[in-house]
Amino acid sequence: MDVEILTMKTTGDKILDRTLDKIGGKGLFVKELDRALLEGRSQLSVHSLKDMPMEVPEKLPILAFSKREDVRDVLVLPKGCDVLDPLKPIGCSSLRRKLQLKEIYPDMQVKSIRGNLQTRLEKLDSGEYSALVLAAAGLKRLGLENRISRYFDTEEMIPAAGQGILAVQGIDGLDYEFLKGYDDLQAHQAATAERAFVKYLNGGCTSPVAAYGEIKDGQLKLTGLYYEEKTGHYLKGYKTGNPSDAEKLGTSLAKELQERCKVEYKESGLQEDNKKEPGKVWLVGAGPGDVGLFTMKGAQVLEQADVVVYDSLVGQGILTRIPASAKLINVGKTCWPPYYVPGED
């Protein structure tokens, strides 16, 4: 079979100065490839399944799933280092990882990082970060397994739905008989359960929902993480069922965790406490942007903030103190006249 490879750079690859939840989510990695299929410029697209939206166009179905590679997330340290530097943040690109890292390394700061794998490793080795959290599969595919310092167990760091699986997408109505031998049944069933779990909870780039399915002894065990954005409460849980009922299993676990989260949150008394305790707004001066001149009180309120509004005068060292769960709002003011805020015009 003769194959012509059409390489493409997506919008998600081009916009690197903002986190994915601020620029439109995972759909930014597939739009250009979808357009190429619809316009007849290509007949197949290959994606990392974890980067695909939960909803795919009816005319562009997922045709096959590859055999799953190593599903785990890993810790990568700078070259020549064997311990974490507590003064520098851990870099990772997903809210799912940030949330779970807070359990594993509660005293470490976590900071977003974008770019392809080589770009991220260069930033790490230049001293910007104490470590990175990445997918093991991506490092192994590029022959960089020697950079891995620690593997996270799938129970302490639940992977993203579809992690370690490549998905083949095509055009509805075309003959893809040749793909039958490529589609891996176990990966297909596990991914179906994982994506059903996330889809029911409306999860994606803007919510740290996670799911991992594993088939053993003829049974599919699905482990999931549900996060309630309004309350900040989250739960992990699992459910076992028949692999042939993968979609139902995913939806069922999602419903259970969602209901349990509501009950536990209510029983904890946090709901009542939130009603009684009004929120506070703190005005914190960032000075000339030098973290060394930041006040202790400013650092304290920043580390406990739920929402942080900042402009371009603030230094990156100050931003690393913001908790991973906080919502960031960049008003975009420039540091020279005329001052400008997005939306003014």
What are these regions (language model features)?
Residues 1-9, 14-16, 20-22, 98, ...:
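Small-molecule-sensing regulatory modules
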Residues 9-24, 316-328:
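N-terminal beta-loop-helix "entrance" segment that forms/cooperates
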Residues 17-43:
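Short, structured active-site "lid" loops
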Residues 32-33, 119-120, 297:
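Short acidic active-site motifs
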Residues 38-47, 127-137, 308:
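Alpha-to-beta junction loops
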Residues 49-108:
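A conserved helix-loop-strand patch within extracytoplasmic ligand-binding domains
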Residues 87-88, 105-108, 129, 302-306, ...:
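Short, well-ordered alpha-helix to beta-strand connector turns
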Residues 275-289, 298-345:
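Class I S-adenosyl-L-methionine
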